[in-house]
Amino acid sequence: MKLRKIFAAVLLFLSAGTAMAQQMPAIPVDKNVKIGRLDNGLTYYIRHNSYPEHVASFYIAQKVGSINENDDQRGLAHLLEHLAFNGTDHFKGNSLQDYLQSIGVQYGRNLNAYTAVEKTVYYFTDVPTTRTTAVDSCMLILKDWSNGISLTKEAINDERDVVHNEYRMRIVGQQRMIERSLPKLYQGEKYGYRFPIGLMSVIDGCKPETLRAYYRKWYRPDNQAIIIVGDVDVNHIEAKIKELFSGIKVPKNAAKIEKVEVSDNDSAIYVIDKDKEQQVDLFQIYMKHNAVPDSLKSNMSYLLKGYMDNVISSMIAARFAEKALEPDCPYLQANAGDGSYLISSTKDAFTLTGVAKPGKIKEAYAAVLREAQRMHEFGFTATEYQRAKDEFMSQVDKALANKDKMKNEQFTTQYVDNFTSNEPIPSVEEESQIWKMVVPNLPLEVINSYAKQLVCQSDTNLVSLVMMREQAGAVYPTEQELSAIVKQVRAEKLEAYVDNVKQEPLIAQAPKAGKIKKTVENKKLGFKELTLSNGAKVVLKKTDFKDNEIAFAASANVGYSTFGKEDFLNAAFAADVLDASGLGDFSSNELDKALAGKQAGVSFSLSPFNHGLKGNSTPKDIETLMQLIYLKMTAVSKDQKSFDNMKSMMATVLANKSNNPSLVYQDSVQSTLYLGSKLARVPEASDIKDINYDRILEIGKQFYGNAKDFTFYFVGNYDEKTLLPLIEQYIASLPNNGFKLKNKQIPYANGEVSNIFTKAMENPQNQATEIWYTKAPFTLKNYVLADVSARLLEMKYLRTIREELSAAYHAGANYGLLRDYDNKAAISISAVAQLNPEKSDIAIPYFFKGMDETVAQPNAEDLQKVKEILLKQAAVSEKTNGYWLGALSTYERMGVDTHSDYKEMVKNLKASEISDFLKNVILKSGNHFEIIMKAVKNGK
């Protein structure tokens, strides 16, 4: 079929005419995935993938979610998902989690599940595949999840409180308003009452047999898919699937999965809500239209629709961002895109989203709608479209170059979507060929014709949701006012957008190149260290982990602790402000346009005792990366519009800080640890006006003007013959300004400190953190001991606080090991949980009990699990460029090799060493900090 006919068919397809579209070619299915279906209807996807090697991911996807619940079952899909981890036919109680952790699968990170409106998915990832018995056991778990979840009365009753705890954690502020608004947004239809977390009254009151009946009704092989991707024998996996799943029967007259339709609305729907915990005034404008039926998603028209949605979204987002920089713009940020209408799959919408400046909700609503109307009337310009095409194709080229280095989850996500909603799954090569044929030939007229269709010109299928901060004296828009704005904007005489583009190179004249003075090779860690003529050092490590990736970092051993109190605020915001500034002769907006289609980026990083840069590129765009490095260190330019927009955004977000329990608690933790210093606290809205742009630019010059202070790291698939001259051109040429900076100590808590306070909130939940802290040498041994100790404690806390007490959705432990101002390590072990207020006083002592028990005798089984997890994670991580950036930086800055002996140290770690570390390093210091936020209901 000729391209002209294809494009005509696409427009017909998008206008809800399917006859022409059905004549178009089908999207090819990737031949490297084995797809099959058993006689009982079970679907399976199996793919061999050896990146990373020796691990695989196991999924079971169900075409079942909250939409399948009856009115008296709201929340059962989610409760059932929880109970899949609390006992099955072959794995009683918590033995499923215990077994998976024993082979290196970490709960939460690698083992989890989620319930959506129309699907429920269970998975465990990065499973070691060197033992066939482990692979077979994992498949047995999938089989149990299919039809063997125990659902004992005891497990159901225990899990009710856990779901309550999750509800307290998730349903806050904006989520609360969405849940309240759904019935009206869906005109009282079923989707309006199927938020996946459900009703707590149903969770509390459902009888065990009711849940079992729901499970039997919907969890059937004809609604399920097994998805296994990784370093596995495909034939063995297929044979095992047939052996385990073929015998599962589908009941006669089994209930059918039926799509729930969403009605059109003849007149506009306006929903305005407010909440005390909402941080910003936000609105969404939906322009509803029919979704593409699943049956047509394998059609080429659907793929082309996705492309057009992508470029339209990127082009209008760029317009919104440019407009937001104008001083009189009433919104802080905005975006638009076409996709599902809220939580439904059977109705789509072109959705506009905006965040208003304080007191400007109506003006912002009009401004965002106006840009959509401008798109409707005039479309986009040729230069805008060219940038969008360039960016899209650069992503396509990057994916193609890395086609053999795709992680398992990139495939499993695609296969879940293919099974549940027939999303296409072409190979990267096939999709790349399609885009290289279509994109250069798809004219702007087709894009603009489609964009015109997206913006409705009547009130039919127009829906607006406004979510605002509840504040004294605030004025909220009415439905009548919003309706009047819509009519006004549609009647306005608009002008076409003018695209102003700077046609200049990033660097007009290349700097005078320096020289590489010395090269030293470290064979143990496989890198080269270059010393340059300006005193800077460069560390190079060539890898083939990703064919099209070069990771970059630069660091110097001084941070914002060097400045006095008068500069704390400026220092805290310096990295963000510098990143939002211009470079050379380019404003931030002009720079975004100039970099379209380039896979290269650099950003500033700044911490108390370190400053630097971080970024990445492809081999093709390595010179752009080097130019950005040079400009970031020599030519940050003032962009007042960008700075003012950033200040407005920060001030708006922080204005309601005192009503946001999460921010209040975070601020309390930081204030307790850093003795109230502004350097560490969450700032107040009133602080933002005191940020001094000129002073930040001066701080930037002091920090980044001394090349000799820096070590630059490049890890990835670079060509050394190409890279070395660029290093001489853009890094060896960097100046030294003579500033001498030195880290200073930041006051930090010591001894026994307690901060217990009360906070009113809508869904009360307590938060507790217990921190044990010390100073010690920065060594590999301390690094391993701190990590292992925290993991052992978390296993205890999950068993006791979550499982036995049902006092929290999650109870965990973390470790911190950071370089301090004096080059020693600041080591901390933290116990954390968001707690049921009624059980908080009972649960908190278990933090200390867990610590005492681990000091006395670490659990031997848990220790072995932790070792397996760490060894597995190390094997996977060490095949990534990011891992090596961290390892080489630690080696260069601290003189500590965290790689070479790591696995042996983990393998040989003894329980007695952990006890000694906790007792004589962590606890002996006597530094213990407790921060507890006790919740009370708003209005009480």
List PLM regions with ranges.
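Bacterial Sec-dependent N-terminal signal peptides
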Residues: 1-23
